[in-house]
Structures are given as C-alpha cells and as structure tokens.
Amino acid sequence: MKSVRYLIGIFAFIACYYLLPISTRLLWQPDETRYAEISREMLASGDWIVPHLLGLRYFEKPIAGYWINSIGQWLFGANNFGVRAGVIFATLLTAALVTWFTLRLWRDKRLALLATVIYLSLFIVYAIGTYAVLDPFIAFWLVAGMCSFWLAMQAQTWKGKSAGFLLLGITCGMGVMTKGFLALAVPVLSVLPWVATQKRWKDLFIYGWLAVISCVLTVLPWGLAIAQREPDFWHYFFWVEHIQRFALDDAQHRAPFWYYVPVIIAGSLPWLGLLPGALYTGWKNRKHSATVYLLSWTIMPLLFFSVAKGKLPTYILSCFAPLAMLLAHYALLAAKNNPLALRINGWINIAFGVTGIIATFVISPWGPMNTPVWQTFESYKVFCAWSIFSLWAFFGWYTLTNVEKTWSFAALCPLGLALLVGFSIPDRVMEGKHPQFFVEMTQESLQPSRYILTDSVGVAAGLAWSLQRDDIIMYRQTGELKYGLNYPDAKGRFVSGDEFANWLNQHRQEGIITLVLSVDRDEDINSLAIPPADAIVRQERLVLIQYRPK
C-alpha cells in the first residue's frame, strides 16, 4: 500500500511540475522560438537530414535534438506544450536513470525515489528541463553514458562488459548527434579519475574500442548523409561551433573561471543546505567506489566547462544527476544522525522566499522604483509572484516543524513557481521576449502581409512559428543566420538598411509589406531612417511598421 501511495505521489508531482503548467508559458526568444521553428520546418519539409531555420541552412547543432523536438510537435501539435514535450520527455527519462542507478548502487528504494524527487525539483533542472533547448537531450545521453560505463565495469563476464561498452558508444554517438564532440570529451574526463583510483585500466583498454566502434557506427549514417548533402557542414560545425565557441579569445558567451559557482548555488535550491555536506561526505567516503564515481561525474564536467572560454548555465546540467544522488544519500544520513543540515536547508528556503517577497514589493507598482517592473493594471501578476515566494517560504517553514519527518517537503518549495510563473511575467518582458504575445496583438495586420522583415533572429523565428511561414526576411542584421545567408540560393533573404528604400519601391506593389523592429523603450520611432509608413503599431520593445501597395 505504501508503494502505491509513493507511486501516486510521484505521478502527481510530475503532473504539477512538468505537465499541467507548461502550456501557460509563452515561448521565449531567441532559444525556444528558434528550436520550435527549426522543428516545424523539419515537419513541413520532410527534410530530416539538413536542419533549416527560416528556410536557410542552420549548422549550429547536429540533428538528433531537432528530431526529438519534431516528434514532440508531431504528437502534440504546434503549441507551447508540443514545443517543450521533447525536453520534458528527456528530463523525465534522465530522472528514470537516476532512479535506476541509485537503486543499483545502494539497493534502497526509498533512497532511489528521494534522489529522483530531488533531481526533478532542483531549480536548474526544472528551469532548463521545461525550456525548449537542446541541453536536456545531451544531459540525458551523458547520464545514460554514466550508467552504461558503470554497467560495463561491474559486469563479471566478457559478454556483459562488451554490451556495456557498446551501449556507452551508442550514448556517446547520440550525444555527438545532439550537441557535438563535447559528448565525447565529458565522459572521458569523468571516468578517468575513477578508473585511476580503482586501477581498472586493463578493462578500459581491452573493451574501450567497442565503445569507439559503436559510437562511429551510430553517427556514420547521418554523418555521411549530411556530408553528401552539405559538404561544408562538418568543417563549420567543428571549427566555429567547437573551437571558436569554447577555446579562442573571441569565444561566444565569454565568462570568468568562477562563473559556475553561483550557478551551482542557485541551481541547487531548494536543497542548497545539503550541498556542502553531500560533497564533503562524498569526498570523505572516496574509498567507496560508487561515491568516487558520482563525485567524478559531478566535478570533472564542472571543471572542464569552467576552463572553457565560453560558458552558459545550461552546459553543466548533466552534473546535477550524480549530484542529486549524493544529495539524497547525505539527506538520509543527516535525517538519521544529525539533522542540522536539514534545518539549515529549511532556513535557507525561508530566507529565499522572504527575500523574493520583499524584492517583488520593491519592483511592484507600490514599491519605491520610479519605473516598476509591473504596471498598476498588472496587479494580479504581482500577487502571482508573491504567491510563488510565499509558497517557497511556507514549505521551507513546514520542513522545520518536525524536521526528521518533514524535511523532504522541501521538494514542494518550487511548486508555486511551477504553477504560477507563466501568469507572473510582466507585460514589458512579454512584449520583448515573447513574440507570441506580439503576434496575438497584431495578428490581423501580420496575417495578410506579402513580405515580413525583422531585425531580430529570435523575433523572426517566433513570427515564422506563430504564422506557420518560413519566408521571414532579415533586415539590417543577420545574427546567427549570417552563414546560411551567404549561400547563393539565399539571395533576397536579407535587406540592409541602406537598401531598404529601393527594395520597398521594387516590391511594394506585390502586396502588404510589414517591418517588425526591436527598439529601445525610450527610442523615438519617428527618428528611424525608413520611408514614411501607412501604419505603425508599437508594443513597447517591438514595433510593427506597415506599407501598403500604392
């Protein structure tokens, strides 16, 4: 009976966090709109080999993540949930691996369930795991590789070892097809400390080549197909997307070495109070083979991405699966022997919730700011934000009422965030970051447009996905589409600011021409260097400028 209650509880937890509220959140640009449109175009064109964005070649990532996203939109439709279905599925599969691996390491069902709940309730896992980017996919393949390598090294027969290494190669191959060669570097770096401390070099050298073979065979069919269709894909993807992004001085998303320290701290909420003890206990018990293995998979990728020039919070998502297992193991030890860390965790959650309540007031219409984040007519959004932090503080307090029994309710601290964040986004944010909001407000003007031009790739992708058309033209700025626009067959998909007046004269009689521009809030649109328009509609950061045939 207790098992049934646990099962019902975990399904209710998943529904409240990962299923029910997802459709209430509009897609964010540039990331979610980009991946939504790439997958929509894949379904519309039937081309499952070469990724395209706005009808242009888009070589920033390989294909596997787009496949999963496309299946999500195929199953659930071109809606907010359909766009995010793939990442949610990947996150839940990763959680299932956490359950299985924890159970295999410690043979404790309660610990396995706790590790799963901790993983799914970690702030960074929830934030990225419900956000349509490719990182939850690569995190799944890396965690699957972590499990596969352990299976291989614990097997007692050559068949078991061979199967484990072959499976490892498949996970690495799918990782390469999802986000590139990092899927090879991270597993190698993560297993080396464990192999060294356990002196298991012999098995690695005898069977490791099987992983190499299965990895190559996994990538080969699509790798050859894309090379035949687009011979310069691999050169661009390797040099620009790997070397320049991570290693060179002009790397994208440059950040200092310590960048991930605050990410780890914030990402570990609502279990932050357990983090120091979990890492310390793991290090103290490093003679235990499983603990060393989990520590290695937590720390080595973190060090690798810290050394890299380019950094984003999403890069270290895979570190939180082994960390969740360490947190769960330490939590049960603390509950049994010394609940001080559990009390500290409760107070941290109370402090976080109270701080959020105060911060919400400061930036609300009734606070001291001259330009509040929310306007007076958005008061319901302020109350939603207050509810988010109030629930966080409440469950933090509840864990302290009988800490030995109630500490696990910290998993419910983000419940308000999950249910209400979609209703609390200020209009001023939505108008700049949610193209869907803009499209809904200007649907009648946009729909009949013969040509639509915009100066933002993220907005262009949002317009394309919402309007179900891939012929959006870039205006003034090429952004990440620069490479695709250089192809001869992309001629006419970009109009510079200097060319716009002549281009407008040439195409005006063909139908309505709509220009969608991103502007500063205090920018005077009358000062824009464009021909006089027939209609102008402004939504804070986005402006619709329309020209009708004469």
Curated annotation (Swiss-Prot):
Which Pfam family, just one, is annotated for this protein?
PMT
Stretches that traverse the bilayer: 7-27, 81-101, 111-133, 137-154, 165-185, 204-224, 255-275, 288-308, 315-335, 346-366, 382-402, 406-426
Q: Which Gene Ontology cellular-component terms appear in the entry?
A: plasma membrane
Q: In which pathway does it act?
A: Lipopolysaccharide metabolism; 4-amino-4-deoxy-beta-L-arabinose-lipid A biosynthesis
Membrane topology reported for the UniProt record: Multi-pass membrane protein
Protein localization: Cell inner membrane
The UniProt family comment states: Belongs to the glycosyltransferase 83 family.
Is Lipid metabolism tagged as a keyword? Answer: yes
Give the NCBIfam families listed for this entry: PRK13279.1
Q: Which organism is it from?
A: Shigella flexneri serotype 5b (strain 8401)
Q: What does this protein do?
A: Catalyzes the transfer of the L-Ara4N moiety of the glycolipid undecaprenyl phosphate-alpha-L-Ara4N to lipid A. The modified arabinose is attached to lipid A and is required for resistance to polymyxin and cationic antimicrobial peptides.
Q: Name the Gene Ontology biological process terms.
A: lipid A biosynthetic process; lipopolysaccharide biosynthetic process; protein O-linked glycosylation; response to iron(III) ion
Report the enzyme's class at the first EC level.
transferase
Q: What is its EC number?
A: 2.4.2.43
Q: What is its main location?
A: membrane
From the Swiss-Prot or TrEMBL record, give the protein name: Undecaprenyl phosphate-alpha-4-amino-4-deoxy-L-arabinose arabinosyl transferase
Task: Output the Gene Ontology terms for molecular function.
Answer: 4-amino-4-deoxy-L-arabinose transferase activity; mannosyltransferase activity
